[in-house]
């Protein structure tokens, strides 16, 4: 009996050693370009996939370069969800694909009603002449969510029902954001605002606003352009100057001082997309938060 127990213990020790030395299964990884896309993807995949984001908090997506660690993870990723028109995407997506031949790239702006640059801010031209900031629109966000879900169903069809069920919940959340923002902005008398980087074109279109960009041709404004913005703000009785947290606040403060308007810091690239959309509406409507 004693010999049997010793043998059993020995086998147990050997098995434990074998399993502890075995390679753990890797996380199932997908990548997204920016944090708002990560929010949507997290809602759809739950904890079944690890969602990595390329552009970290507080960094602009126009000229970002992925880190070596990100490139390693991209080599293990199953899918990449892009906006399709961000500066760094144009420079890096082909490199991502060459790093990982099995990487499937999904463009989340597919079937979104895109804004051509000359429609709203001709002085700021992005690549391919398209305003890429589609996530600033709750209406476009519905299509973004659908595109992410469709991509997940394609790469993981066995879990299609799970993804579609989560999509329904996410769409309900997006609709609630849309309703809240509509209510907050319904009676705002002045439908114009100044913004440093024109990231709210789709938001402005959805809710009947006009955005005036401080940036000129994607660069820090010249004194001449700054004066033009100031004169427009004065003549249009514009009350707010919006600036994203990743940009220098100095030029926004100059305009605010000259026009008597108020500087408002926003973060449309933040992960918590619903809160950011509602916060922007609250600030534009002067509703206490």
Regions found by a protein language model. Give the residues of each.
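Positively charged n-region of N-terminal signal peptides that target proteins for export
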Residues: 1-4
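Short amphipathic alpha-helical "recognition" segments used for binding
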Residues: 6-7, 248
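Bacterial N-terminal signal peptides
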Residues: 7-16
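Extracytoplasmic metal-acquisition and chelation regions
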Residues: 17-289
């Amino acid at each position: 009996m004693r010999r049997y127990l010793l043998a059993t213990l020995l086998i147990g020790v050997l098995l434990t050693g074998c399993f502890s030395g075995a390679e753990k299964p890797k996380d199932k990884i997908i990548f997204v370009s920016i944090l708002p896309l990560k929010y949507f993807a997290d809602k759809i995949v739950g904890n079944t996939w690890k969602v990595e984001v390329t552009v970290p908090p507080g960094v602009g997506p126009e000229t970002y370069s992925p880190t070596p660690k990100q490139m390693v993870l991209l080599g293990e990723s199953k899918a990449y969800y892009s906006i399709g028109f961000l500066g760094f995407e144009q420079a890096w997506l082909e490199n991502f694909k060459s790093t990982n031949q099995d990487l499937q790239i999904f463009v989340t702006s597919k079937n979104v009603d895109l804004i051509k640059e000359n429609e709203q801010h001709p002085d700021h031209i992005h690549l391919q002449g398209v305003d890429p900031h589609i996530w600033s629109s709750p209406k476009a966000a519905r299509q973004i969510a659908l595109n992410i879900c469709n991509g997940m169903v394609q790469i993981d069809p066995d879990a299609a029902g799970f993804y579609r069920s989560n999509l329904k919940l996410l769409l309900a959340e997006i609709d609630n954001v849309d309703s809240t923002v509509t209510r907050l902005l319904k009676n705002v008398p002045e439908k114009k605002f100044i913004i440093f980087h024109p990231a709210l074109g789709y938001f402005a279109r959805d809710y009947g606003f006009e955005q005036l960009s401080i940036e000129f041709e994607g660069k820090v404004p010249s004194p001449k352009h700054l004066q033009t913005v100031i004169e427009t703000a004065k003549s249009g009785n514009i009350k707010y100057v919006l600036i994203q947290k990743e940009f220098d606040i100095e030029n926004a403060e100059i305009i605010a001082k000259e026009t008597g308007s108020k500087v408002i810091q926003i973060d449309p690239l933040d992960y918590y997309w619903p809160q950011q959309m509602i916060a922007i509406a609250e600030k534009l409507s002067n509703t206490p938060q």
